[in-house]
Amino acid sequence: MGRELPILPASAQQAAEGQPENFVYSRVFCQKENSPPLRLLIEFLKSRGQLPITPPDMDQAGLDEWAWVQVGLGYHRDRKPIQLFCVRDRGSYKDVFEQEQKYFLELLSSFDDIEAHLATEYVTRSRFILTTQMQADVTEDGYDFNGWILEFYQENCNGLVQVDAQGFFSPKGELIVDLTVPQE
């Protein structure tokens, strides 16, 4: 895997590349110190009626690793897998973590309501950021699969969900900080 992880917010990535966004990004800003091993996520997905498809070269030891950085999990054999990235406040990708954290703190600084303050606290106190990257043409099944992934990290890692072009969501799934771009 290359040094550059493609997990910048959609607006920053579009501007840097000068091309339309082909992916949908969502994140969970997690306050727990460590990400759970992938095996726990896969067991959670199965308990919710999902059938996650792991990479063919992933071994059992990889499923028990807590310090993973990137993995693709499939939701349907005929569709591209959802890419999961986990960057932490320490280690090799600390700079990526800090860049993401700074970007969202700057976005939230323009809001002065209690919900934005709550989101700011979550972003500030986060120890790792779980990011999902989906193809823009993802199916409804893919959105559901992604939603279960986000819920797992939100519930198990004291996290707050953020979806690009939408905003931050409460644990009940309600939009609490609207980051949509107003239409002119």
Please provide the spans of the model-predicted regions.
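Acidic (Asp/Glu-rich) sequence patches and key acidic residues
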Residues: 1-184
